[in-house]
């Protein structure tokens, strides 16, 4: 039994080593580069491929992988929106993901970043760097006085709800697929417009779909309270970045915490020190004191990376042995 793992980072290697010790019957090859047409031939002779990347898995790459005899693909992440689904179906590829590598990791950072915005931490850091120790005018707000609107109440959204409640905030939610327990608590509103109108903070925890592309746009911002806070810890395509800039300029949005950006692949997880970033929209957001950007690191904890490696590799092994996996993704 042989599995090849692509895009293996140095910080993932200890967790792969642990998995290999626990599964001595599996031969594993670790490749640091992303899966591309140039290196897909390395998969020849392997039973499965374990992968992670934001870059698209194109039809060409998937077809070549299938041509090499690899039909079992385990993703070390949640999202499957970068897979060429028609090719997956046509070639009969088995796909698995890691649906819950650490909801708490993402939820915790979303609340942490919001607290920085509410407590004016970026502004005080800027003043302290200049030895300005005055308080005014950067007075803070308390989360316990606010209503938080959670869009998407799955595993991550639910973890965020629990933390927000712990701070004493009122929480309302919206989801096409409602959680029965939350519904009993009367937490849901019926429409996004209701959530926009009531929430002081809006946090996104939904997958990227065609139906929610740029769901936060000029129209959505216009329906929000003045001075709302926006948290995007889901997918970059959920927000129209140019419309967000306009909302920040007008004061409709008081601040934003973003762990993702729709054109992030050219920027995030790269060392660009001393280089010019040509994306003017990104730089506009990046240079604002009331916008906090973290480069897709909400998941990045020891617990999460362990789970990403172990769950994905276990699923690949299940595919090889049985043709099915606990975390198999079905494309209807």
Swiss-Prot record:
Matching InterPro entries:
D-isomer_2_OHA_DH_cat_dom (IPR006139), D-isomer_DH_CS (IPR029753), D-isomer_DH_CS1 (IPR029752), D-isomer_DH_NAD-bd (IPR006140), NAD(P)-bd_dom_sf (IPR036291)
Catalytic activity, per the record? (R)-lactate + NAD(+) = pyruvate + NADH + H(+)
Keywords for the protein's UniProt record, in alphabetical order: NAD, Oxidoreductase
Establish whether keyword Amino-acid biosynthesis is in the entry.
Answer: no
Q: Short name of one Pfam family for this protein?
A: 2-Hacid_dh_C
Could you name the active-site residues? Answer: 235, 264, 296
Q: What is its EC number?
A: 1.1.1.28
What molecular function terms (GO) are annotated for this protein? D-lactate dehydrogenase activity; NAD binding
* Record's miscellaneous remark: Also active on D-glycerate.
Oligomeric state and interaction partners are given as: Homodimer.
Question: According to its UniProt record, which protein family does this protein belong to?
Answer: Belongs to the D-isomer specific 2-hydroxyacid dehydrogenase family.
Q: What is this protein called?
A: D-lactate dehydrogenase
The organism named in the record is: Lactiplantibacillus pentosus
